[in-house]
Amino acid sequence: MAFKFKTFAAVGALIGSLALVGCGQDEKDPNHIKVGVIVGAEQQVAEVAQKVAKDKYGLDVELVTFNDYVLPNEALSKGDIDANAFQHKPYLDQQLKDRGYKLVAVGNTFVYPIAGYSKKIKSLDELQDGSQVAVPNDPTNLGRSLLLLQKVGLIKLKDGVGLLPTVLDVVENPKNLKIVELEAPQLPRSLDDAQIALAVINTTYASQIGLTPAKDGIFVEDKESPYVNLIVTREDNKDAENVKKFVQAYQSDEVYEAANKVFNGGAVKGW
């Protein structure tokens, strides 16, 4: 009986080893990749990249959707996904600094301009003294929004603040605006809040309620923006064949046409 037990144990160990090897091979399959994207319009664009990847490169792209900007990098860092496509460089740089992720950009996608939207006013001339203006609360998009508010003359920031100013850097506020920081996904809903006169919203979230910068924005970030979105992976995965194939598929004419259709001309090619 002891001999039989050892034999079965050895066979079990061998099967377990083979299973582990099989899993490792699947994870490194050059013809499969898991990519994190934000649900909504960017997901629609990624679905076109998914089709191009399959048709042109034989790559099976599994899209994993997220509802916020925090989880996609966390999932990537943990190895739950192989890449993500949702963030611009200033945001990635801040995440690397704050969280210590070993992530790297491997390709550009698009610039999706942010814009100021309102259901209360139609021009900045109508913005009343003391109005509440909603902006995203993550450091990079907060800074991006404040820089845009400065560009349209609503506030003035301290010199030399770079791309990451905060409300503490506001040195002039002629209309005594109250800057309200909210989670980015909440910004579209804030337009229905009686207290919010204006909201600065990323195109990704604005598009979820049918808003586009060119058509609906009271003011819009220009096309010279440094906030080009990226395809990001782990540092130890940057040379993987499936990552290279996905970048090639995303940077295609088909995806560019789809992005401009989905965002009504609001997508600027970044490659």
From Swiss-Prot:
* CDD domains, per database record: PBP2_lipoprotein_IlpA_like
Q: Supply the Pfam families for this chain.
A: Lipoprotein_9
Q: Does the keyword Ligase apply?
A: no
The reply on keyword Cell membrane is yes
One GO cellular component term of this record is: plasma membrane
Covalent lipid sites (S-diacylglycerol cysteine) = 23
Provide this UniProt record's keywords sorted from A to Z: Amino-acid transport, Cell membrane, Lipoprotein, Membrane, Palmitate, Signal, Transport
Question: What family does the entry list?
Answer: Belongs to the NlpA lipoprotein family.
What else does the entry mention about this protein? The MetNIQ system is also to be able to transport the toxic methionine analog alpha-methyl-methionine.
Protein name, per record = D-methionine-binding lipoprotein MetQ
Which gene is annotated as encoding this protein in its UniProt record?
metQ
